[in-house]
Amino acid sequence: MSIKKIEMINFRNHEDTAFDFSPGINIIWGENGSGKTSIIEAVHILSNGKSFKTNRLIETITSNKKEAIVKAVFGDKNMVFHQTKKPSKKIKINNIEKSTKDLVGKNPTVLVSPEEEKITKGPHSERRRFFDRVFSNISKTYFNNLINYSTALKNRNTLLKQQKDKHEIEIWNNPLIKYGCQLWEERKLLHSKFNKNIEGVCGGYNKKVDIAVSLDCPSDTGQNRFKNRLNEKLEKELFLGRTLSGPHLDKYTTNFNNKDLRVYGSQGEHKLTFLIFKIAEHGFIKNETGKKPTLLLDDLFSKLDLERGNAIFDLIKSSGQTFITNTDLITAEQHGIDINNPNNKTIHLVRSWKN
């Protein structure tokens, strides 16, 4: 489902701007600080209920203003994002308020931006977060198990920090075990499928590249074994104030040509792996759900050589609606994008003297 138009009021540096979009490729270009990224950030918030720039949506409100409003037409639906300084966030679809949970998987997006590069360069927690988000987009069951497990984990950790009675702590063991084991079961299945998508992308690359993601989790993920691990580690957990067993500790390791990318990878290998991850993510969501995710490319072409840029262009050709931000049109053309195609649209932004 493509976004037809958007209006932003006091959102970042957009005081009152509106744009119509093409269902194909939309190139948003202009100098830095002109508000290019803010447009795809707004699309991301409406699709996911979250920003990729900040965890505090109050920061999206224009300086010295009381609220930010984004209105958009997604297919046949009217959507509104309203953020006040209380702080309070509301997202409505056809005047019916929706939670972030309601939005997950409805209008999936694939974001390719500098903020996402930590997927390969960052700690295991970044890759867990990435895969949890991707898997939640294609499986409501996975998402619900993740939410329920996270709630049980948070409550159990609170009791551990407070040095509560063991019987109180054990109250949260049952939901932790139930949802944790269900999470493990589906995580292993989806992880295997995602690796096959990576393998397919690597097979189409003109250089010999072998990339795979290993998942380090217990070999026995049954409920009895999980319960035993919790009992065995309880004394240490009380001392440290946190739960020491469960899916929240799983480790994803990226191997590039049989070596740990995070430890031994070059900058070029990180960039290539990141792009392959994103191409695989797009194909994975499309294959599993039948939906073509909206592609959000933020300031990408200026950082890519021609070969890697062409790999992204191949992704664009297989995508639905695409948004690209760039400082000029020349590099987009160099990577094969026809700016004169009537199915594509260019939007030129000029930096305001107020910014």
Residue ranges and their predicted role:
Residues 298-300:
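Walker B catalytic acidic pair
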Residues 103-106, 113-178, 352-355:
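A conserved P-loop NTPase coupling/switch region
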Residues 36:
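Conserved lysine of the Walker
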Residues 47-126, 132-138, 142, 195, ...:
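Nucleotide-state sensing region of NTPase/ATPase domains
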